[in-house]
Amino acid sequence: MIYTVPETSTVVFDIRENYPTDEIVIKEIWEEDVYEVKETRLNRGGVVIDIGANIGAFSLYASYYGATVYAIEPEPNNLEALKNNIKLNDKENQIYVCPYAISNYKGTAIISDQGGDSTIVDGDILGSEVEVMPLDNFFALYHIKEVDVLKIDVEGAEPEIILGASKENLQKCKYITMEFDHRTGNRLGEMTQKLSETHHVRTMGSWERGGMVWAWLY
C-alpha cells in the first residue's frame, strides 16, 4: 500500500502488509517529531547518520530537508523496504544505504526480523547473518568528519554503540537522538554518563519502560 505523508504531498512510502509498525514509525517521525530534529537541525548539505534505518522514515525525513544521509540497516526485509522507499522518492543520490549492524565489536551476528523490528539474537535462533562493526570503524570506512544528527533506534542495543565508540568520534556528532526500550536495561545510566562527557544530555522515560535520549554537543 502506498502511503503519502500528509505534510508534504510528495513523500511516499510503500507500507508492507503484516508490518503494522511501518505506519507507526512514519507518523512518529513525520508528525510527532519524536527525535526532536525538525528542519532546524537538518541543514542543507549537512550529514545525518541513521542507525536502525528500518524502512527509511527518518532517512527520507532528513533528506527532505536537504541532508546527506547514511542509512544503516542490516535486516534483509527492512533493507529491501528501505531501498524501495528511497527509489520511490528518487533519493538514491542523497541517501547511502549501509547494510551493517553497529555495535561494540567487529565480526558477524545473527539478526532476527520481528514484524518490522529487528534485533541481534543468539546463534540458535533463526535469522540472517550480518556484518557487525563499531561506530569508529564505520566513521573510518565512510571518512566521516562531522555529523549534524546521529539517530539511533536499535531495539535495546544503543549502549553497545555508544559505549563502543571513542570520545573523539562522539565529539564529531553535534546532536545525538535515540529511542530506547526495556531491553536497554540498567546500562542506560552508563550510556548517558559517557555521553555527558561530550554532550548536554536530556532523557525521558526509564529503562524499565523505555523512552528517549537527546544529546547536543557542549
Where are the predicted features?
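Phosphate/nucleotide-binding beta-alpha loop and adjacent structural elements of enzyme active sites
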Residues: M1-Y218
